[in-house]
């Protein structure tokens, strides 16, 4: 039974997802449907967590908009997400960056990872 579920899950996995980790800054293009119209909205922020595996994998992006922190959780393999752009790589030592919620201003900035 699990082999059948794995094959169904593999059919709905996306192949165009970049390799990103918590601490990275990403630009998520989300399809928003308003009435009978649809448009693409961008949500740019820092990935604070990545959770799950396979079809159920999700990631949470945090940004500060007009001095209010906004977090949004997206499924990785959903068709609502048009594309995920990796803007910068962050240098962090944790897998879950919940401590960023308490920080303000420059303290909430993440160092950029240097290519070596």
Curated annotation (Swiss-Prot):
InterPro entries: Ribosomal_bL19, Ribosomal_bL19_CS, Ribosomal_bL19_sf, Translation_prot_SH3-like_sf. GO terms for cellular component: cytosolic large ribosomal subunit. GO terms for biological process: translation. GO terms for molecular function: structural constituent of ribosome. Gene3D superfamilies: 2.30.30.790. It comes from the Bacteria. Keywords: Ribonucleoprotein, Ribosomal protein. This protein is located at the 30S-50S ribosomal subunit interface and may play a role in the structure and function of the aminoacyl-tRNA binding site. Belongs to the bacterial ribosomal protein bL19 family. This is Large ribosomal subunit protein bL19. It comes from Streptomyces coelicolor (strain ATCC BAA-471 / A3(2) / M145). The lineage of its organism: Bacteria, Bacillati, Actinomycetota, Actinomycetes, Kitasatosporales. The gene is rplS.
């Amino acid at each position: 039974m699990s082999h059948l579920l794995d094959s169904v899950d593999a059919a709905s996995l996306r192949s165009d997802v970049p390799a990103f980790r918590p601490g990275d800054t990403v630009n998520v293009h989300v399809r928003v449907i308003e009435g009978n119209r649809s448009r693409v909205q961008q949500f740019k922020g820092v990935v604070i967590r990545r959770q799950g595996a396979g079809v159920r994998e999700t990631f949470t992006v945090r940004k500060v908009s007009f001095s209010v922190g906004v977090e949004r959780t997206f499924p990785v393999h959903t068709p609502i997400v048009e594309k995920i752009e990796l803007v910068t790589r962050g240098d962090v030592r944790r897998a879950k960056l919940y401590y960023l919620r308490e920080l303000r201003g420059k303290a909430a900035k993440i160092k950029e990872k240097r290519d070596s």
